[in-house]
């Protein structure tokens, strides 16, 4: 009996132990990342040939303590390597783990290699060659703190490399992981198994090989034991011969084609067919090109299992298309697969919530570096009937009848859309708000920018369960897609939290996707993906229009200008000159592009990058019209002092008065809820203010009276 160690992905140790026991292994002991076991020669070969879950099968040679690189070298050079292989065999070393002295795995591998070749020289043999591409012998070294285990890798290439997969799609599963998913799915041998997003077919092929009694390594040509002196060819031939005989017997039983794979991509489906042919299970699997939205049950008379590894994104904010995909998938499952079991493997648990199914079992697993989850469900006949009843519900519009998701939200969004879109067309605008937290349960905003939709989630209150808030967001995205009919790649999802300083201007992506929208004759660039904001504050639309109407023949200043959209309106309104000041180079360049887009060029349009307050203190020219829309609060590193609009607005007005011409006007706005203008402070400066907030709220923002406040400030002497 030999002591061996089977490695596997973390989370699969218990499954592997069961498999090894079934294959005849003895004394199986689970440890992190694998299972220790004992086996005689035939069982050893049977495990190598039949394991579907192990990554490698290792034969430990040396176990020792390593406190220095000398300890490592001494342990290796003192081993009798001729007991394992001769000098003609090419070898390589895999080294995993570090400690305080052995800090790099490459260094560890080099010292093991040195010890082996030096041993051969010491006993008067030629140095064996190192071959990292196709070695005859693979030495595996694992260092955990001070404990070193050196093993002979009997597998050779990793055991997930079955040999049948010649090509894959964009996101392939390792075969060992696929086998584990199948085993955890609850699927029973002999019953139908369907994968509606099968990709290169790995899940179905692994399951089909189980049903066909095909050993996963049956066609492997090279093994790690081929040049091992302890290899027993007779025992190996016996075990392999038994496996071949079992596969042939099963093949002759005329098994039904109980496996069914679908995918939207016909090219990857062709690869799946070739993979199945290579794996010897092509006769068991039917393939069909198709969309999940039209998914049908091909096994109407039977009960089986749907298994799937659908696509998933690393970041929720980049996956509105996936939200729609999972939502539609869940609907089709309930409509088509009554009394079936379903098992879904995903790297984004939130997306699984879009299925709107209740799992009865779930497992955690790793797919490479990604933390993933596998959830098992049962589609009851009652759930199927409920979904059918929802389709016939008279309470919601026919555009929504494909889903029971967020009905209240969907109805409100649809009602708002009918009203606002008609008004927007009359106004000559194509960027506007459709929904703004109208319902407390759906705390988000929905904005249209031409043929794009932006869904912005507001930060949920602390007393709201995070999972519930996320589920509502996902439901709202699904409903938004259905109501608006927007293409999934033109829906942008953003998570908005309370702002701190100027972090609203932090970059989120670098796609550079700009397009322009129309606003009362002005064309304005927007970017929906790269920043938390889009480059256009929609609630200030009427303010910009008013500024344009006030600007004719005047020298105008836009302070805290952002992307200069107000400057564009004032310039188009006939301003004599414009001065645009902002601290951000990015947004100042954006402002310049906005001017150019509207054919506004010339020396009369000045763009100044500066700390606005410092620039204002130095400014020595005067203006007829000043628009100032400062942040509520800022503590930017590029500013000398912090800024608070409530605390500091009189200081700001003091400086603005200095550069305001007689009969001039200041339009002052901010977004601080509950802002109180210091009327007495203004009076002491010789200024008076009239609030015009209600007049600057457009129809699409009338439900949010406090989104901004706006004031017209003039010199008292001019009144």
UniProtKB/Swiss-Prot annotation:
Q: Which reaction does it catalyse?
A: guanosine(2445) in 23S rRNA + S-adenosyl-L-methionine = N(2)-methylguanosine(2445) in 23S rRNA + S-adenosyl-L-homocysteine + H(+); guanosine(2069) in 23S rRNA + S-adenosyl-L-methionine = N(2)-methylguanosine(2069) in 23S rRNA + S-adenosyl-L-homocysteine + H(+)
EC number from the UniProt entry = 2.1.1.173, 2.1.1.264
Instruction: Name where it mostly resides.
Output: cytoplasm
Q: Which UniProt keywords apply?
A: Cytoplasm, Methyltransferase, RNA-binding, rRNA processing, S-adenosyl-L-methionine, Transferase
What molecular functions are annotated in GO for this chain?
A: 23S rRNA (guanine(2445)-N(2))-methyltransferase activity; RNA binding; rRNA (guanine-N7-)-methyltransferase activity
Top-level taxon: Bacteria
What residue stretches are annotated with the THUMP domain? Answer: 43-154
Q: Where in the cell is it found?
A: Cytoplasm
Q: Does the keyword Protease apply?
A: no
Q: Name one GO cellular component term.
A: cytoplasm
**Family per record:** Belongs to the methyltransferase superfamily. RlmKL family.
| Free-text function comment from the UniProt entry | Specifically methylates the guanine in position 2445 (m2G2445) and the guanine in position 2069 (m7G2069) of 23S rRNA.
| NCBIfam families (UniProt xref) | PRK11783.1 (NF008748)
Name used for this protein in its record: Ribosomal RNA large subunit methyltransferase K/L
Phylogenetic placement of the source organism: Bacteria, Pseudomonadati, Pseudomonadota, Gammaproteobacteria, Pasteurellales
